[in-house]
Amino acid sequence: MLVSEFDYELPSELIAQHPAPQRTASRLLHLDGRSGELRDLRFSELPRLVGSADTLVLNDTRVVKARLAARKTSGGKAEIFVERALDARHALAMMRAGHSPKAGAKFIVGDGVQVIVEGRADDLYRVAFSEDIEGVLERFGAVPLPPYIAHPAAAEDAERYQTVYAAAPGAVAAPTAGLHFTKALIEEIRGKGAAIAAVTLHVGVGTFQPVRTEQVEEHRMHSERYAIPPATIAALAGRKVLAVGTTSLRALETWKLTGKSAGESELFVYPGFRFQVVDRLLTNFHLPRSTLLMLACAFGSKDNVLRAYAHAVRERYRFFSYGDAMLIERCTSG
């Protein structure tokens, strides 16, 4: 299967640079993957689409201020993007320093925090901090906005690039389908009799990386940490599962495939994948050729989803992290 099959034309002005004025003010495109029917809705209408047979699964990961401005000991500028903390003072990170730093290279963050490169770890670097990483990120870190958002991170982003139910620090990108929810909307859904459950999948830096292969099947998926508590597993039994975001879906389907309720997920979902847990998917509009778009196409069928995207472009929906959302009913044919 060619990666080019998941391309589409998107006018740049449809890439949302800021969130909607209110979280629930976004639009919602409802796609029935079985019939192909499309409906243009508002996100605030979501509660009327759920009922007492449903379990809504949220990803409660919390975005950390992972982007650090740094300087070389020679005085040049650099950037350290912390992908994950390994312990209190060691991390895996992306480095932007003009050239690939070698083991032993030193960088300075803020008022004198030293960061020393210890070596490579695939596409990342293992680095050591002279102070606890959590405190360094809180004092000097910036919200790691996606590269297609042109403005520097501001106070608005610290609030709006975070879900209202975020609890477990560890993500370097938001699970964006959840950005549309308010606590009041969640309670309205609960009032319909739906169960609300949580998983944790810490979105990694790989979510920003393009697919570089020509064939879909040759792409190597990045690894992300996930955990599913026993209460969530219990809440799935005998119910229709609505996954809020591709990350929630990947955590649930990884658990079903491996039998492990916690660990590392490298699950790559593309057309042909057999879903065993999730019945409905709430997700934003994704980049052309991305693994996230491939997942959506696997769930709702490629023809249906790409037709829905063409409709969204015509109707001037807002795209990507700060954009509008889709609710996809799983395609059960094929």
Locate each region found by the language model.
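Surface-exposed, charge/polar-rich loops and edge strands
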Residues: 1-334
